[in-house]
């Protein structure tokens, strides 16, 4: 009896060439249904329809096609088992040797936020997962293929005889395939039915194993959804990305997106902006008239810290910008695009990692912010709500000037991307000093003001949390700061406001805290 291959795929890439090889080179009988059968028949291949094989017509508009003992019995039968052999003979069920199945495109369907409940439900595959799981369970006797990129490897192995190791690997990939499918369904339903699902599930495929983690003695791997977020990034040149590179790139991108991200249409940047990050904290941020101008100002904000940093730009990188990027040692640059001349210039820095990340990939990423704790995960929304200056209140006697208002808005956009306790000193669309990660707020203020130096005079100061005492505002006033922005909400707000009035500072309360841990 000729071996049988059952083929039923949603993704039909490569299916004809696979079927041709199975039939013409290895003598397989082809068993198929629905659209896959038609594709194979149109290619001139002899196909036995599943309905003909089972003697049962497809019913319920195609919802029931392969759920039949002559299909599942043929897949699950253990060769050489006397009882199974008797059952196969008694019920005239031929064994099925290869199962090639991938599933209805549920994840792709629900990627459209406007998809209806009914459309999503119709894209939940039933027969496909049942066949995949059956074949994976019986992998000692059946090979199961769930992705087109497995076809060539399998055909090469088939010529020499498929060994047990390959069957086990294919079975693992099959169970990963169905598990990810079920997770996608339950996650989508959970989000649609409740803000907080009873289980948090997400299946994210491995993108690459990293050389090491944050330190050389730590193992690490990068898991990423294809075409979503960093999974949609294209590395144009440079060394392999590291764990620390990715963490810093994430921080840099989040910061630069405060000013828009993209080059045209719906993704046009609101202001040309550049961000330099070290150890996940922005050390230089600026806006400018053009990306090159913004980059120059961001680097000038703290050239010492910028050495070995990560840069994010929110617009197209041209030749002028590229020359600025080559002026000092950098680890990575991410932008929505690079002009050909810029690529040529940057090629002189062979180790510099260039990443092109399209705005569409950024938009496709989910809004969950996930961190692990011992034995679990914490899931929260991203802190990315639009900043609305019209909701702010002036607490001091003096209101900020129009110029100070612009600076306060800029500093407030930046401070929520600095590790708490966070203080930012800024002026004219440029960070002048950043105080990050100190255990008390006045300590962060000292760092930011020291970094700003004489430029602090006439600048503004932003704080991610309220002032528990008036010491930070008093320190700011002594350094010449002219306006302060903070959430408010301290029992001693009046003390800090009084210091502002004493020194003629303007104070704005946002009513919203932005801790970052």
From Swiss-Prot:
Gene3D superfamilies: 3.40.140.20, Methylglyoxal synthase-like domain. It comes from the Bacteria. Keywords: Hydrolase, Multifunctional enzyme, Purine biosynthesis, Transferase. SMART domains: AICARFT_IMPCHas, MGS. GO terms for molecular function: IMP cyclohydrolase activity; phosphoribosylaminoimidazolecarboxamide formyltransferase activity. The keyword Hydrolase applies. One of its GO terms (cellular component) is cytosol. It catalyses: (6R)-10-formyltetrahydrofolate + 5-amino-1-(5-phospho-beta-D-ribosyl)imidazole-4-carboxamide = 5-formamido-1-(5-phospho-D-ribosyl)imidazole-4-carboxamide + (6S)-5,6,7,8-tetrahydrofolate; IMP + H2O = 5-formamido-1-(5-phospho-D-ribosyl)imidazole-4-carboxamide. Pathway: Purine metabolism; IMP biosynthesis via de novo pathway; 5-formamido-1-(5-phospho-D-ribosyl)imidazole-4-carboxamide from 5-amino-1-(5-phospho-D-ribosyl)imidazole-4-carboxamide (10-formyl THF route): step 1/1; Purine metabolism; IMP biosynthesis via de novo pathway; IMP from 5-formamido-1-(5-phospho-D-ribosyl)imidazole-4-carboxamide: step 1/1. GO terms for biological process: 'de novo' IMP biosynthetic process. Residues 1-146 form the MGS-like domain. PROSITE patterns: MGS. Its EC number is 2.1.2.3, 3.5.4.10. InterPro entries: AICAR_Tfase_dup_dom_sf (IPR024051), Cytidine_deaminase-like (IPR016193), MGS-like_dom (IPR011607), MGS-like_dom_sf (IPR036914), PurH-like (IPR002695). The IMP cyclohydrolase activity resides in the N-terminal region. NCBIfam families: PRK00881.1, purH. This is Bifunctional purine biosynthesis protein PurH. The lineage of its organism: Bacteria, Bacillati, Cyanobacteriota, Cyanophyceae, Synechococcales.
